Design a protein with these regions (language model features):
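Aromatic- and Gly/Pro-enriched helix-to-coil junctions and flexible linker segments
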Residues: 1, 12-77, 108-115, 125-132, ...
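Long amphipathic alpha-helical scaffold segments
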Residues: 97-200, 206
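Residue-level detector of Asp-centered blade-edge/turn motifs that repeat once per structural unit
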Residues: 145-146, 216-217, 267-269, 319-321, ...
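Residue position within the beta-strands of beta-propeller blades
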Residues: 151-153, 159, 220-224, 272-277, ...
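Structural motif
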Residues: 175-177, 231-242, 282-292, 334-343, ...
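Multi-bladed beta-propeller domains
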Residues: 187-207, 245-260, 297-311, 346-363, ...
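Asp-box/WD-like beta-propeller blade repeats and closely related beta-sheet repeat scaffolds
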Residues: 229, 235-295, 301-314
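Loop/turn-rich, solvent-exposed surfaces of beta-rich toroidal or solenoidal domains
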Residues: 365-453
């Protein structure tokens, strides 16, 4: 057996070989070759059933195998199983010959197979013979050396209901552990999986182990483990971080407490990043606890929060330049199903930024940088689970374009919205060269996962499969370069005040011609209010919230609006996807009109923290609180919203951040300017609104304006008029809120599931598109004189996306929790 390439000794724990426990009906013969044949036949069947209508299908759109290369995938997808195998065999011969390998024997073998094909056509026997021949050549590639020692986990699939609920409703069946697969080379120098051996570093049979990752020197492995028996009597069982040496010794638990700690990632300075529920917030859009990015010393001390997101995040990995790449969920005023995208952040928690994915119909997981390339490899996941096809992302094509995506497992259709599949699918790609990737693959009709090697040309070869238990998260166990340690430079004066600083060079950059210079007067900083968890008497935090919509800041199951039209230039909204909500129509001027039909206003509580002035040259310079989920809104002189940031941003204490404009092209260099006007003076403090910077309450802020100016006529006495009283109905919804929202008098972005992804054009949503203000401008309302402050209460509410309550109190308990100063409850 090969020694680890790091030079450390292989462990002396017993070596195990898998028992062949797959049903006899699944195998042609009960041997390793029978398992390989099973994998081959599964591959043949999935290619035959390739979806011809999906946007990423090569039967619909062709794509190259390498960035900027010739069309490749469409022709390959149209071949029979034998034709495709022989084509890939021929291409593989050419690529390895170019590396200097002697492939004369394979050329003769290919010629013989082609002769057989003329007589046998697409027979099973010929297909299997061709696949075995290609497999033997594939394993000769010298670039597969990192696959000689593969770290992975054995565990049963969790099968959660959502991609963010594994810790709540996943099915953690005990068994497995942290293992190393040692793959020898045969006499001809090729990898020989038939004689591979498995070594157990950590026995997880009394629970479930997951997500192992080796330190940069390859001598320590970090992972998460959840024991079947809770560590504290009366508590649930939790995922906690563990470490073990690669000689199999020194296993120890690193974290503890009523929290789930998962997905470790070694940091360049020797610390560990990880994902945790220590944020003690709920994942809004359903029931479970949220989990976000943290860091700590490798002994479990000095735990520090890096991400202040309100939703969940997972699977962090280091980039070559020293940042953390990970998946973040965010639904800031948009539908949920495509809101799981790729982000990066510095290890000190500063400068989180989108890497890829907003406004595409896909979700992205397990992203890794591809060596010797600007590409990323990832799994195209769904809102429902963490598996799907493996895709390459060509970042030179932009941050939001589906043209940047190439599925290299096109026989697996992407899953959309809440779709999920546990068979004939992939997850956990790990690059070992520019062209090759370790993956977990469930090849057949059973949800059973093995370890595969695949490449960007559509080749895939089984490396290891245990018929008794799934094998997941393969990574090379070897030393690897340590990324640079990025400098930290917080401003101590700002940090002491719990603040950071933002500067914007020119808010008009990115707005196009829709907003004339001089119209933007204010930048408003708003907050998504976190839904903190209830602490239970036993010391744990509440883990589920059924029925979940009764814990929302707006009961969207009890009140919703009408269809809204919004203008966009995002072509992804027209894609060949099964969107569950709304429609999109192309306009003659190159834009699209998206109709959103779900009618859900914001179910997240919001707060206006304050505004700052926009200088004459469009620049802004201001301080803002650190540790909060923020977003920006650009306002005119009347506080009408011109454009909205439908993503989130944060600050660490003392952090300084800058941007070029509002919705600018982030792949373009900003215009060179002299010092902006806003930077010639000290940073502005946020000016809070007249009602205060606390979470926004419709009843506290908006209803008094309606009482003063509207209720004298709109008192519910006449059915043809809106009832704008604050009286609560049986659902605890004010009559005024229901009338304005359900009657279609206000315009907002739809939060419903299944919505289309798009970036809205300026001034095509919110206050400026609301019928309410059109009605107020008509003659019959000539005597309604709103003060500037009263008008601002209405515009702020609409442009916060019409939230109702400032908190997440369980709806049936709201009546008892209501301050007496708020509007009365209707009598039964």
């Amino acid at each position: 057996r090969d020694k680890l390439v790091t030079g450390v000794q292989t462990c002396a724990l017993p070596i195990s070989r898998p028992a062949l426990t797959l049903p006899a009906s699944a195998l042609r013969e009960p041997t390793w070759r029978g398992i390989v044949d099973y994998a081959f036949l599964c591959e043949r069947d999935t290619w035959r059933r390739m979806d011809a209508k999906d946007e990423l299908s090569p039967l619909l759109h062709d794509r190259p195998a390498t960035p900027g290369g010739a069309p490749y995938w469409s022709a390959l997808a149209r071949l029979t199983a034998v034709e495709r195998t022989l084509k890939q065999f021929d291409d593989l011969i050419a690529r390895l010959a170019a590396q200097g390998l002697d492939v004369s024997g394979e050329r003769r073998e290919l010629a013989a197979l082609r002769e057989r094909a003329q007589a046998e056509g697409d027979s099973d026997a010929l297909y299997l013979a061709a696949r075995h021949a290609k497999r033997q050549l594939f394993f000769r590639d010298p670039r597969l050396a990192p696959a000689a020692n593969v770290l992975f986990t054995k565990r049963h699939p969790l099968h959660p209901s959502h991609n963010y609920s594994e810790h709540m409703d996943g099915q953690p069946v005990s068994g497995g552990g942290i293992c190393v697969l040692h793959v020898p080379r045969d006499a001809d120098g090729r990898l020989d999986p038939a004689h591979a051996e498995v070594e157990t570093l950590f026995d997880g049979s009394a629970g479930v182990a997951r997500h192992p990752v080796a330190d940069f020197d390859g001598q320590t492995v970090f992972f998460a483990y959840r024991p079947e028996k809770p560590e504290v009597d009366g508590w649930s069982s939790y995922w906690h971080l563990w470490s073990v040496r690669t000689d199999g010794g020194g296993a120890r638990r690193l974290t503890e407490g009523p929290f789930h700690d998962m997905d470790p990632v070694p940091l360049p300075d020797g610390d560990l990043g990880f994902i945790s529920t220590r944020c003690v917030t709920r994942f809004l859009c359903w029931q479970p606890q949220a989990y976000v990015l943290y860091r700590m010393k490798r002994d479990g001390s000095d735990i520090r929060r890096l991400s202040f997101a309100n939703l969940s995040e997972w699977d962090p990995a280091m980039t070559r330049d020293g940042r953390i790449l990970w998946t973040r969920s965010e639904y800031q005023d948009k539908g949920a199903d495509f809101g799981h995208t790729l982000w990066s952040i510095r290890p000190d928690g500063t400068h989180p930024e989108l890497v890829f994915g907003n406004n595409t119909p896909y979700c992205y997981g397990h992203a890794r940088e591809v060596p010797d390339s600007q590409e990323l490899v990832c799994t195209l996941i769904s809102h429902g689970d963490h598996q799907g096809p493996i895709a390459l992302i060509d970042r030179s094509k932009g941050l939001y374009e589906t043209d940047a995506l190439t599925s290299i497992t096109p026989d697996t259709r992407p899953q959309y919205q809440m779709d999920r599949t546990h068979q004939e699918t992939f997850r956990f790609p790990e690059p070992i060269s520019r062209d090759h990737f370790l993956v977990s693959h469930s090849p057949g009709p059973r949800p059973h996962w093995g370890i595969y090697l695949i490449d960007r040309y559509g080749n895939r070869e089984l490396l290891y499969l245990d018929p008794a238990i799934s094998c997941k998260k393969p990574t090379p166990l070897q030393a690897r370069p340590r990324p640079p340690r990025l400098p930290e430079a917080p401003d101590p004066a700002l940090a002491a005040q719990g603040l950071g600083q933002f500067t914007v060079q020119d808010v008009y950059e990115g707005l196009g011609t829709a907003v004339p210079r001089g119209r933007a007067k204010y930048l408003q900083v708003s907050q998504e209010v976190p839904p903190f968890l209830e602490r239970m008497s036993c010391g744990e935090y509440r883990s589920t919230h059924p029925p979940f919509t009764d814990f929302y800041a707006t009961p969207v199951h009890k009140v919703k609006g009408l269809a809204h039209e919004i203008v966009t230039k995002t072509r992804n909204a027209l894609g060949a996807h099964a969107f569950r909500q709304g429609s999109a129509v192309a306009n003659s001027n190159g834009t699209l009109t998206v109709t959103e039909r779900g009618g859900w206003p914001s179910y997240v509580a919001k707060a206006v923290l304050g505004t700052v002035p926009v200088a004459d040259d469009g620049s802004v310079n201001f301080t803002a609180p650190a540790g909060k989920v923020l977003y920006f809104q650009l306002l005119d002189a009347d506080r009408n919203e011109l454009q909205r940031m439908r993503s989130v941003i944060q600050l660490q204490p003392g952090e300084r951040r800058s941007c070029a404009g509002c919705h600018e092209d982030r792949l373009q260099l900003p215009a060179t300017k002299q010092t902006t006007l806003a930077l010639t003076a000290p940073a502005c403090a946020l000016e809070p609104p007249p009602w205060g910077a606390q979470p926004f309450s419709f009843e506290r802020v908006v209803q008094p304006t309606l009482d003063r100016r509207c209720v004298s006529c709109h008192d519910g006495a006449k059915k043809e008029r809106l009832d704008l009283r604050g009286t609560l109905d049986a659902d605890l919804v004010p009559a005024s809120y229901r009338a304005l929202v359900s009657g279609g008098w206000v315009h907002y972005f739809d939060w419903i599931y299944g919505a289309r992804p798009f970036k809205a054009e300026p001034m095509t949503f919110g206050t400026l598109r609301s019928r309410l203000f059109e009605a107020l401008a008509k003659p019959q309302h000539k005597d309604v004189k709103l003060s500037a402050e009263e008008r601002r209460t209405l515009t702020a509410w609409i442009d916060l996306n019409c939230p109702l309550w400032p908190d997440y109190i369980y709806r049936p308990e709201r009546a008892a929790a209501r301050p007496s100063s708020l509007c009365p409850t209707a009598k039964p």
